[in-house]
């Protein structure tokens, strides 16, 4: 195991426009960090640079205190798990798991011992004699993880390993990866576009956007205090409601652009840097708008209601803004119904419309 450090890491191709812009992060020994963002944000490029599959244009990558910019992937003491399992079809599970050690000249007895140990961790013991075609998608991904485990690397790198699995298997594999990290405590960097994977797996999340690290922090902090409108809209399902408008001179109301006046008394508290009488983007998550006794409320004309099982989502519009409200299972408003919604001051977020950055 080892700490991983990225200092001012930038990437461009042929001296053209940069695709990664000055990434700075220190990942502690044994920490599980998730890079999350939409397609094209630079997360996989950054992972490939850590692995040595892409060169570093500027900056420094260090593993265990050793700068690895000039080292080949095989010399970085890392193991990688890919989206595509990359298993040899003619080899058994045991042979696939041990092949990387075999080509490195590791003794057969040690290979067998490590394969057996990894198989026990991943519950692959009964499958060791099978070939990939005889395995399910989840089993194949566990074999790919086992191949990484037997290396006993300093750092695990996961490149969207669950993308090829169906929804049920993704949930199962998320739990298995959690248990694996709890058992091995190996430094891990995990790439995904799925914010649910990021929130459930990570000790810290790095939210990527257009080559920048928009926010780095614990999942709960990123969710509760998004640094930008991008983070607010990307993290959370459904996304945070973002409303353009103007805060009244007394700070007691927010006038949604082409929409209603909303009561927000107490939201622009002292020291939060939220100036009244100016334009803001107001953010509030759907679950914080559930009607509560005694809360200041507005009304929303319901366009549709999604029945999700444990809870429901009511949808409507304030001006040009789509608004979603999470409701308990028993509340199922119909189209055209007027729904009272809460706007608790403690759960309101204000963002600068010019920069998209959070205030306060």
UniProtKB/Swiss-Prot annotation:
Primary subcellular site in the record, as a coarse category: membrane
InterPro entries: AAA+_ATPase (IPR003593), ABC_transporter-like_ATP-bd (IPR003439), ABC_transporter-like_CS (IPR017871), ABC_transpr_MalK-like (IPR015855), ABC_transpr_MalK/UgpC-like (IPR047641), Mo/tungstate-bd_C_term_dom (IPR008995), NA-bd_OB-fold (IPR012340), OB_MalK-like (IPR040582)
Residues annotated as domain ABC transporter: 4-235
EC number: 7.6.2.10
UniProt superkingdom: Bacteria
Catalysed reactions, semicolon-separated: sn-glycerol 3-phosphate(out) + ATP + H2O = sn-glycerol 3-phosphate(in) + ADP + phosphate + H(+)
MF terms in GO: ABC-type glycerol-3-phosphate transporter activity; ATP binding; ATP hydrolysis activity
Recorded GO CC terms: ATP-binding cassette (ABC) transporter complex, substrate-binding subunit-containing
Chain residues that bind ATP: 37-44
Record key words, sorted: ATP-binding, Cell inner membrane, Cell membrane, Membrane, Nucleotide-binding, Sugar transport, Translocase, Transport
Location of the protein in the cell: Cell inner membrane
Biological process terms in GO annotation: carbohydrate transport; glycerophosphodiester transmembrane transport
Membrane topology note: Peripheral membrane protein
Keyword Kinase: no
Short name of one Pfam family: ABC_tran
Subunit organization: The complex is composed of two ATP-binding proteins (UgpC), two transmembrane proteins (UgpA and UgpE) and a solute-binding protein (UgpB).
UniProt xrefs under NCBIfam families: PRK11650.1
Record's function text: Part of the ABC transporter complex UgpBAEC involved in sn-glycerol-3-phosphate (G3P) import. Responsible for energy coupling to the transport system.
UniProt record similarity statement: Belongs to the ABC transporter superfamily. sn-glycerol-3-phosphate importer (TC 3.A.1.1.3) family.
The protein, known as: sn-glycerol-3-phosphate import ATP-binding protein UgpC
Organism field: Burkholderia pseudomallei (strain K96243)
């Amino acid at each position: 195991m080892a700490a991983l450090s990225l200092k001012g890491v930038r990437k461009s191709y042929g001296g053209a426009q940069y695709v990664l812009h000055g990434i700075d992060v220190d990942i502690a020994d044994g920490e599980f960090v998730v890079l999350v963002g939409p397609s094209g944000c630079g997360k996989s490029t950054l992972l490939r640079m850590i692995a040595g599959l892409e060169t570093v244009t500027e900056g420094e990558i260090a593993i265990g205190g050793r700068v690895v910019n000039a080292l080949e992937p095989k010399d970085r003491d890392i193991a990688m798990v890919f989206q595509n399992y990359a298993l040899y079809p003619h080899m058994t599970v045991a042979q696939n798991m041990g092949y990387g050690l075999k080509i490195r000249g590791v003794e057969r007895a040690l290979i067998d011992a490590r394969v057996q140990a990894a198989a026990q961790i991943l519950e692959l013991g009964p499958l060791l004699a099978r070939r990939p075609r005889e395995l399910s998608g989840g089993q194949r991904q566990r074999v790919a993880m086992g191949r990484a485990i037997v290396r006993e690397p300093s750092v695990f790198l996961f490149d969207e390993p669950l993308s090829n699995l169906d929804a049920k298997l993704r949930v199962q594999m998320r739990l298995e990866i959690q248990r694996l990290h709890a058992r091995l405590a190996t430094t891990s960097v995990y790439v995904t576009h799925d914010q649910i994977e990021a929130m459930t797996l990570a000790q810290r999340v790095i939210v990527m956007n257009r080559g920048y690290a928009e926010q780095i922090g614990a999942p709960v902090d990123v969710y509760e205090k998004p640094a930008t409108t991008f983070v607010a809209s990307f993290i959370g399902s459904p996304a945070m409601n973002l409303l353009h408008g103007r805060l009244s001179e007394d700070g007691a109301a927010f006038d949604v652009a082409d929409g209603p006046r909303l009561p927000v008394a107490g939201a622009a508290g002292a020291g939060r840097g939220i100036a009244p009488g100016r334009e803001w983007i107001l953010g509030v998550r759907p679950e914080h708008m559930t009607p509560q006794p005694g809360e200041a409320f507005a009304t929303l004309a319901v366009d549709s209601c999604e029945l999700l099982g444990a809870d429901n989502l009511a949808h409507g519009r304030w001006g040009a803004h789509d608004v979603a409200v999470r409701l308990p299972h028993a509340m199922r408003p119909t189209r055209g119904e007027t729904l009272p919604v809460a706007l608790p001051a403690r759960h309101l977020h204000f963002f600068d419309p010019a920069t998209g950055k959070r205030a306060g």
